[in-house]
Amino acid sequence: MAGHLTSDFAFSPPPGGGGDGPGGPEPGWVDPRTWLSFQGPPGGPGIGPGVGPGSEVWGIPPCPPPYEFCGGMAYCGPQVGVGLVPQGGLETSQPEGEAGVGVESNSDGASPEPCTVTPGAVKLEKEKLEQNPEESQDIKALQKELEQFAKLLKQKRITLGYTQADVGLTLGVLFGKVFSQTTICRFEALQLSFKNMCKLRPLLQKWVEEADNNENLQEICKAETLVQARKRKRTSIENRVRGNLENLFLQCPKPTLQQISHIAQQLGLEKDVVRVWFCNRRQKGKRSSSDYAQREDFEAAGSPFSGGPVSFPLAPGPHFGTPGYGSPHFTALYSSVPFPEGEAFPPVSVTTLGSPMHSN
C-alpha cells in the first residue's frame, strides 16, 4: 500500500507550482486531500473532484449533487458539490446559518424553501372543516339516540316476552311488511348501516307504542306465527300410483285439463298434484334425452385418440420411478396412426407395481 501511494503521490508538486524554483515546495509527501483541493492560479484550470479535468483524470463519472438537509426537510434545487468553487478564487469558509460549503443559493441571501402544500388545497380543507362540524354533531347526536333506542327496544321486548321473530311478524301485521329475525337482531346490536337504522327506527318506535297500549298484540303475534309456520306438506305418492302415472305418461306426455281431471279422479289424487307430476316428468325427460343425445354424438364422432397405446422410452441415464406407480421407464402415449408391425417401439404393458428405483 505504501508503494502504491508513493508511486501516485510522492514527490508530486501541486499543479501550477514549480518544484525546483526558488520559494517552491521541497520534494516530499503530499497529502492527497490537500492536493485534490488545491486551486490553481487565476485563469488556470482548477483541480477537484467532479470539476474540469478532475472526473476525466481520475476516470470517475460525474455523480448527482448531494442533497442538503435543512431542518430535516430535503429540497430540490441547483446545488454544487462539496469542493466545487467558482473559478478565480480559493474556497472560503462560510459562517453558520448559511448554506453549506460550496453550495450556491438560488437567491441573494435567501435559503431555499421546502416544498409546501398549495394554498388552494388548504383553503378547500378549511372550507370543509367549517361546513362539517354541524353535520358531524348532528350525526353523532342521531347515533346516540339510536343506541339508546336500541337498548330500550331490547328491554321492552324481553320484558313483554316477545322474541325477535315475533317483533318482525308483528311489524308485518301492523305495517304490511314482515322483517326477519336477523334484521331485528342486527338493529339491536347496532350492526345495520346508519341509513337503514334511521329507516327502521320509526317502525320499531310504533311497535313499542303498540306493545304498551294494545293488550291483544300478543295474540295477534301468535296467530301470525301460526300462519307463517304453516307450510305446504310435501306430496307423497305411492309406488303403485307412480307406476300408473308413468304408464299414462308414456301414452300421453302432455294431457289436457280434462284428462288431468279424469286421471286424478281414477287415482284418487288432487288435480294440482297430477298436473305438477306431469310437468316435472316432462322436464326430467328433456334432461335425460339431451344427455343421451350428447353421448350418442360423442360415440359417433369417435375419440380423438383412436390409435392404440404407443410407448416411448425416456432419455438414457439414471431414472427414478414414481413412488407407488411402479418402475416403468416408458411413457404411454396415444397416436392417431398406430405404428406398423416390425418397427421400433412396440407397446409395452406394465402389470406389476415395483418400488422406486435409485441410481448408485
Curated annotation (Swiss-Prot):
MF terms (GO), sorted A to Z: DNA-binding transcription factor activity, RNA polymerase II-specific; RNA polymerase II cis-regulatory region sequence-specific DNA binding
Keyword Transcription annotated: yes
Modified residues (Phosphothreonine): 235
Domain POU-specific intervals: 138-212
Annotated binding of DNA, by residue: 157, 164
InterPro entries, alphabetized: HD, Homeobox_CS, Homeodomain-like_sf, Lambda_DNA-bd_dom_sf, POU, POU_dom, POU_domain_TF
Positions where Phosphoserine occurs in the chain: 111, 236, 289-290, 355
Principal localisation: cytoplasm
Record's comment on post-translational modification: Sumoylation enhances the protein stability, DNA binding and transactivation activity. Sumoylation is required for enhanced YES1 expression.
Motif 9aaTAD: chain residues: 4-12
Keywords assigned by UniProt, alphabetized: Cytoplasm, Developmental protein, DNA-binding, Homeobox, Isopeptide bond, Nucleus, Phosphoprotein, Transcription, Transcription regulation, Ubl conjugation
Pfam families: Homeodomain, Pou
Role description: Transcription factor that binds to the octamer motif (5'-ATTTGCAT-3'). Forms a trimeric complex with SOX2 or SOX15 on DNA and controls the expression of a number of genes involved in embryonic development such as YES1, FGF4, UTF1 and ZFP206. Critical for early embryogenesis and for embryonic stem cell pluripotency.
Protein known as: POU domain, class 5, transcription factor 1
Annotated organism of origin: Pan troglodytes (Chimpanzee)
Gene, per the UniProt record: POU5F1
